Amino acid sequence: MDSFSTSIWVNDVTVRYNNGHTAIHNMTFSLNSGTICALVGVNGSGKSTLFKSIMGLVKPQQGEIKLCDLPISQALKRNLVAYVPQSEEVDWQFPVSVYDVVMMGRYGYMNFLRIPKAIDKQKVQEAMQRVNIEHLAHRQIGELSGGQKKRVFLARALAQQSPIILLDEPFTGVDVKTENAIVDLLQQLREEGHLILVSTHNLGSVPDFCDQVVMINRTVIAAGKTEDTFNQHNLEIVFGGVLRHIKLLGENLHNDEDKRSVTVLTDDEKAVVFYGETKQDPPAPTTQNCHFEDCPYKSAVKNKRD
């Protein structure tokens, strides 16, 4: 990872648009290498604006952002941050191959003629192999499924060889197999020292692979280790009435001996389940995945849904 200290440092950042709308206000947090962090918030909470600010596309009116201890302009020149979009606003009928799209990740290393060198071709090949799309290299990207396109954009980011990777809703429009493959890759990248910031509304997946969480609603509501931060109290503050909120008691569950209280917060994709110790106790701030089709409590959950 070169000699840079891989980090994201956001200090007292405020962004206002020309119409007077304040997208983010006094936002402060920091992240270091070897981390997968979930950026969690409702639509309109400032997630996209924060990503644009980190990428240098939006300039804050107040505060400062540094990447690897460098101002954004210098960090971008050094290819220190890569971005994996939720989708690309392009004409999918335009004839461009998967190989060419992944090669775009090498543009920052080329001169204005953009003639790839041997090292560029090598890194593109390695990136495609890592996300298992080498067999798609000569396909037109417009022919691919949503999940395949997502892997192409991820390969492009890998080809860029950036220590910081931003991913915007990487699990939207992908099947379970692709989601699991993406999670496995992100965990490998974390072990290699990358810093990965993932914007997501798929709450049920967060405890699976994210060791840090930044929860926002135009400002930082909570930030820290997942086990300390990703809890019922903070989720209710961040999401308010957006999520369904179901509270069950042990006697309503399949196991008659299980008298723990259960609180379910769900956006109807994957639920986050909080367990109390007894039916009298409030739910403890621990999490477990619960997909309605797989959860042992699914009957009780479905019967109690609003």
Swiss-Prot record:
The keyword rRNA processing does not apply. GO terms for cellular component: ATP-binding cassette (ABC) transporter complex. It is a peripheral membrane protein. PROSITE patterns: ABC_TRANSPORTER_1 (PS00211), ABC_TRANSPORTER_2 (PS50893). CDD domains: ABC_Metallic_Cations. This is Probable iron transport system ATP-binding protein HI_0361. Keywords: ATP-binding, Cell inner membrane, Cell membrane, Ion transport, Iron, Iron transport, Membrane, Nucleotide-binding, Transport. Its main location: membrane. One of its GO terms (molecular function) is ATP hydrolysis activity. Residues 8-243 form the ABC transporter domain. Part of an ATP-driven transport system HI_0359/HI_0360/HI_0361/HI_0362 for iron. Probably responsible for energy coupling to the transport system. It comes from Haemophilus influenzae (strain ATCC 51907 / DSM 11121 / KW20 / Rd). SUPFAM superfamilies: P-loop containing nucleoside triphosphate hydrolases. ATP binds at residues 41-48. GO terms for biological process: iron ion transport. The keyword Iron applies. It is found in: Cell inner membrane. Signal peptide: none annotated. The lineage of its organism: Bacteria, Pseudomonadati, Pseudomonadota, Gammaproteobacteria, Pasteurellales. Belongs to the ABC transporter superfamily.
